Amino acid sequence: MLELKGRGAIVAGTRRIGSAVVKRLAREGVNLAIVYRSSRDAADALHASVRDGIERACVIQADLSSAQDVKRLVDMAERQLGELSFCVNLASDYPRTPYQLLTAADWDRAMAAAKGAYLLALESSRAMQRNAGPTRGHIVFFGDWAAEETPYRDFLPYLTAKAAVHFMTRAFALELAPHGILVNAISPGPTARDPALVSSAEWKAALAQAPLHRESSEEEMAELVATLLKLETVTGENIRVDSGRHIGGTMLDDEEPGA
């Protein structure tokens, strides 16, 4: 298993689950590049909370849908951290739009997130190839439990983009295996309800469909990330952390999505 201490990691999308991931990796002694798109204050606060416990940490602004921005981000992270072993990409919007209101702009917005996942994996993997050892790096995408065969309503472009991320996980894993780089995905189910998107009633309905009837915690996701990064023979996997909701299926009739 890999020793994480002293290795460099990019973590993109550092609010909610991403914040927990940054804090968990900091406890392992991982040097961190905290990447944000527009929430500078939140990124700075997160940086301040971890910088004293690790050797190196930095905050970098980037638009992941821009190839130029992503290349600049990876180059800067590698310089600031000394080397780059890990990339954890949680950057994604969660736009809820009823089918009747969908437009081309909704599709473009969702596909921009998938493009960002592709670009960041591409550039970070090229940096990882400069590392020594049989395991040179590890990329972790974040998907969605429902982006396989069980979609829920009102999130069509978002779930389509996440399905692309799931396929990218396997494709990148195959391409990068000869270079000693592992690629996996984590797909959360109901985790830390956002009241602006999901009502209490909808949340209860979502949990009722999960066999365990429990929501996952941000800390549980972060623990899984830390564990995955230590492993050296797991690649191409999509791990669903959803209390078994994918077994229960999607919501039908007049029920509303809650994840």
Predicted segments, located by residue:
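A glycine/serine/threonine-rich, flexible loop-to-helix segment
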Residues: 174, 178, 185-210, 215, ...
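Conserved NAD(P)H cofactor-binding loop of Rossmann-fold oxidoreductase domains
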Residues: 90-96, 244
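Substrate-binding pocket helix/loop in short-chain dehydrogenase/reductase
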Residues: 98-99, 105-110, 206
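Catalytic loop of short-chain dehydrogenase/reductase
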Residues: 93-94, 133-164, 169-178, 190
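Amphipathic alpha-helical dimer-interface segment in Rossmann-like NAD(P)H-dependent oxidoreductases
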Residues: 112-133, 173-174, 226, 230
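Canonical Rossmann dinucleotide-binding motif of NAD(H)/NADP(H)-dependent dehydrogenases/reductases
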Residues: 2-33
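Conserved Rossmann-fold SDR core element
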Residues: 25, 166, 173-191, 234-241
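C-terminal substrate-recognition "lid" of short-chain dehydrogenase/reductases
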Residues: 217-241, 246
